[in-house]
């Protein structure tokens, strides 16, 4: 299992945020990646996915708690621009990843960040830690 290193950057994908915030069965595996906010990178597509899921399943108050935490990472938030969109489209064609997953993976690749997830779509891809 990969553990965070002070010199590396990490993207915890939507599945990891939901597990961690909801104290799911894999929350403990994701917890170390949230301990150093300076090492976290947060793609805006992750904000969308997590906020929506929490809003639907846990309500507005819980979703807004996540949003407040996401705002604390504003300096590490990566916005989808045209270059990243094209890179993600290429990744999707090459790997078969769905759109949101391709954006997340392309963001990690672009930044040289490790992607930490429990989503089986990412299994076998370079730079991915599957919990």
Positions of predicted regions on the chain:
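Short, well-structured N-terminal submotif of metal-dependent ribonuclease cores
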Residues: 1-42, 55-68
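Acidic, PIN/NYN-like endoribonuclease modules and their adjacent C-terminal/linker elements
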Residues: 1-7, 105-131
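Histidine- and aromatic-rich ligand-binding microenvironments
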Residues: 12-13, 42-44, 96-98, 119
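Conserved glycosyltransferase catalytic-site signature
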Residues: 14, 82, 101-102
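A generic structural signal for short hydrophobic patches within well-formed alpha-helices
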Residues: 17-18, 47, 122-123
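Amphipathic alpha-helical segments within well-ordered protein domains
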Residues: 51-52, 89
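Acidic catalytic patch
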Residues: 71-93
């Amino acid at each position: 299992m990969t553990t965070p290193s002070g010199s590396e950057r990490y993207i915890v994908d939507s599945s990891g945020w939901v597990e961690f915030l909801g104290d799911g069965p894999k929350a403990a595996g994701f917890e170390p990646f949230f301990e150093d906010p300076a090492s976290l990178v947060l793609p805006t597509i992750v904000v969308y996915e997590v906020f929506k899921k929490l809003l639907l399943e846990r309500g507005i108050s819980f979703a807004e708690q996540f949003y407040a935490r996401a705002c604390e990472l504003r300096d590490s938030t990566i916005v989808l621009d045209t270059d990243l969109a094209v890179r993600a489209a290429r990744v999707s064609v090459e790997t078969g990843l769905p759109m949101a997953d391709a954006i997340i993976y392309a963001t990690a690749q672009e930044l040289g960040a490790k992607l930490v997830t429990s989503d089986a779509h990412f299994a076998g891809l370079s730079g991915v830690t599957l919990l």
